[in-house]
Regions:
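Outer-membrane beta-barrel "beta-signal"
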Residues: 448, 482-497
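Residue-level signature of outer-membrane beta-barrel architecture
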Residues: 146, 185-189, 247, 304-307, ...
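Surface-exposed coil loops of outer-membrane beta-barrel proteins
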Residues: 208-342
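Repeated loop/turn-to-beta-strand initiation elements of outer-membrane beta-barrel proteins
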Residues: 153, 191-195, 251-255, 309-313, ...
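Outer membrane beta-barrel transmembrane domains
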Residues: 355-364, 387-402, 406-413, 417-457, ...
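Transmembrane beta-strands of outer-membrane beta-barrel pores
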Residues: 159-167, 201-207, 261-265, 307-309, ...
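N-terminal periplasmic/intermembrane-space "pro-region" immediately following the signal or transit peptide
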Residues: 21-158, 162, 171-172, 184-192, ...
């Protein structure tokens, strides 16, 4: 309980600093000013006719935190205004148009909300998610904008207090806290290139090395001597410290370089805590280590090429998972490789397929290498009855000892209005770590939950939520899960955005 209280106090102090800094920024102007050109910063606008987007011009202002997908408010994107006399970059997709109403987004001295180009190319910034991954462009972002000269700075933070209960001999109960504070800064150079910086910190290590009870979860180690089984490990204090540089080649093409220590390689879908289909779900997917467990890698370099709605990228990164020491930097090895192809066929869809060759991911099995294949489809759409987000993902791990393990995930969120969110997830995994000397096949989990948010102030909201999970696991004495394993969580959440 002492660690949980310390985590809450630390993160609330950090979030208070964010809000205090924002309150000192100049007042916003009236956002309803069609045709208004932003001083020194140029938005992505829509031009009539079939003409392709013009090349980027320097210093456009941006509306989101690339690589840090923020909770969407469930509201439809507002209408745009054509700006025929403005010679800034144009975009053909509706999701890349000028926006005038994104709740929680204060554009500081301009008073305007913009959908701007991404850090890695000439598409809408709302397409960017964790690392260099993509999400549907229609999924909105929110965050706090702070003016910083020629730089655009965005901040976001959240802290949750969770009461967890997992049934049976392999379960347990615990009260703990999870948290993240994220920052992004970007600048467009005179030649049209874009520089981006990102940082993400977490107070999770304060919960203790062993993490929290979660039936059927496995991966990494808590003490350096044994695998963590039926528990979810905490994230490292340092989740991301990265930089990116992109250069436009033409109206629709660009190349980019991304480096992080730690960072996220081009492997898997967006990390679960940033996925638009899982933003409000406090439970870590049990398929995490088949899909997106490499999202914290101590040493990543990614090079990529973007052509309109396609992105091809390759990463060289450290394959070893973070060790049990959650407050330090791990050794950078750059011994593993990943390739990913992403395609956004429409503003509502984001697809990816990726393949990773991972060297010695587990410190307890240093001679065991892994080939990982993932494929996923993420969907987001605003309807008259609310917004819907969903992800379908599959993952395969082929280990160098011949073991072959698969995982399947289907998750979603429904927001009937900005205050309520209902979320659900279904998963199936194959794992030898859950049963020493054998392999559990067909294990799975189905969870359902909801959260009610209350707006406290312009940049603050507080939520109350809960979920219930039904687990499917072998009932043999060696498995020891019992006949009907299940679990539940009750949680509170404070968000600065």
């Amino acid at each position: 309980m002492r660690a949980t209280s310390a985590s809450f106090v630390t993160l609330v102090i950090l979030l208070s600093g964010i809000a205090a800094a924002q309150s000192a920024s100049p007042p916003a102007m009236d956002p309803n000013m069609p045709g208004m050109a932003m001083p020194g910063k140029k938005p992505v606008t829509k031009k009539a006719g079939p003409k392709k987007p013009a090349p980027r011009l320097p210093a456009p202002q941006q509306d989101a935190m690339p690589g840090m997908t923020m909770p969407h408010d469930g509201q439809p994107a507002p209408p745009h205004h054509d700006m025929p006399d403005n010679d800034t970059r144009t975009a053909e997709k509706p999701s890349q148009e000028m926006s005038h109403d994104m709740p929680g987004m204060d554009m500081g001295d301009t008073g305007h909300d913009m959908t701007m180009h991404g850090l890695l190319g000439g598409y809408a910034m709302s397409r960017e998610s964790s690392g260099t991954s993509w999400q549907p462009e229609d999924a909105s972002h929110s965050g706090i904008h702070l003016p910083a000269g020629d730089w655009m700075v965005m901040l976001h933070g959240r802290v949750s207090g969770i009461a967890d209960w997992q049934s049976g001999p392999r379960g347990g109960d615990q009260v703990f806290s999870t948290s993240m504070v994220m920052a992004m800064a970007s600048k467009d150079l005179a030649n049209g290139d874009t520089v981006g910086l990102r940082a993400m910190l977490s107070g999770d290590p304060l919960m203790g090395r062993r993490g929290y009870p979660l039936l059927l979860a496995s991966g990494e180690t808590a003490d350096g001597t044994s695998h963590l089984v039926d528990r979810q490990h905490p994230h490292d204090l340092l989740m991301e410290l990265s930089a990116s540089y992109s250069h436009p080649l033409s109206q629709s093409d660009s190349v980019f370089l991304y480096a992080g220590y730690p960072g996220e390689p081009a492997l898997g879908p967006s990390a679960y805590m940033h996925r638009v289909s899982a933003l409000d779900n406090p439970m870590t997917p049990i398929a995490h280590h088949w899909l997106d467990s490499s999202h914290i890698a101590f040493g990543v370099v990614t090079a990529g090429f973007v052509h309109d709605d396609l992105k091809l990228e390759a990463s060289r990164f450290t394959g070893r998972e973070p060790d049990q020491f959650r407050f330090n930097f791990d050794t950078a090895r750059f011994d593993s490789t990943a390739l990913r192809l992403s395609w956004n066929p429409s503003p509502n869809w984001s697809l990816q397929v990726s393949h990773g060759w991972i060297k010695s991911p587990e410190g307890l099995d240093p001679t065991l290498d892994e080939r990982r294949l993932t494929a996923s489809a993420t969907y987001f759409k605003q309807f008259d009855f609310g917004s819907v987000a969903a992800t379908l993902a599959v993952g395969n791990k082929h280990l160098s000892d011949g073991t072959d393990e698969n995982a399947l995930l289907l998750e979603g969120e429904y927001k009937p209005d900005p205050d309520w969110t209902v979320f659900a997830r279904g998963e199936s995994i194959e794992s030898k770590e859950l049963l020493p000397g054998g392999q559990i096949r067909g294990a799975g989990e189905i969870s359902l939950g909801a959260i009610r948010d209350f707006r406290l102030a312009e940049h603050w909201k507080f939520g109350l939520g809960g979920l219930y999970a039904f687990d499917f696991a072998p009932s043999s004495p060696t498995a020891s899960y019992g006949s009907a394993p299940h679990g539940a969580m009750a949680f509170i959440r404070l968000v600065a955005e």
